[in-house]
Amino acid sequence: MIKKAFCMQVYPDQHAEYQRRHEKLWPEMRQMLKEHGAIKYQIFLNPETSTLFGYLEIEDEARWEQIALTPINQKWWNYMEDIMETNPDCSPMTAELKKVFEL
């Protein structure tokens, strides 16, 4: 199992909307994540900085990277573009985090 952590930024006035959209995650998006090896996927929000912290457990890095090519993921990125910082391809701007401790 591979553990990954990363940060993203949601716009300060969009915290509730970000949470609402994830509470209503499309079933086909949920299925696609699992099919691409997501074992556990959690996102936390620091409301003071609007920083999102993502934690992910996956089975295989190469398989996971293929999600960017799926039509449902492209649709999700477009859906989320108006409420968070994104790249020109609408993917969320992310900063990978380095694990420095585990108990």
Curated annotation (Swiss-Prot):
Pfam families assigned: rhaM (PF05336)
Localization per record: Cytoplasm
HAMAP family: L_rham_rotase
Keyword terms of this UniProt record: Carbohydrate metabolism, Cytoplasm, Isomerase, Rhamnose metabolism
GO cellular component: cytoplasm
Protein function: Involved in the anomeric conversion of L-rhamnose.
InterPro entries attached to this UniProt entry: Dimeric_a/b-barrel, L-rhamnose_mutarotase, Rham/fucose_mutarotase
Protein species of origin: Enterococcus faecalis (strain ATCC 700802 / V583)
Official protein name in the record: L-rhamnose mutarotase
Residues at which substrate binds: Y18, Y41, W76, W77
Family membership noted in the UniProt record: Belongs to the rhamnose mutarotase family.
Record GO biological process: rhamnose catabolic process
GO MF annotation, one: L-rhamnose mutarotase activity
Active-site residues from the entry: H22
Ranges that cross the membrane: none
Pathway: Carbohydrate metabolism; L-rhamnose metabolism
Swiss-Prot/TrEMBL catalytic activity: alpha-L-rhamnose = beta-L-rhamnose
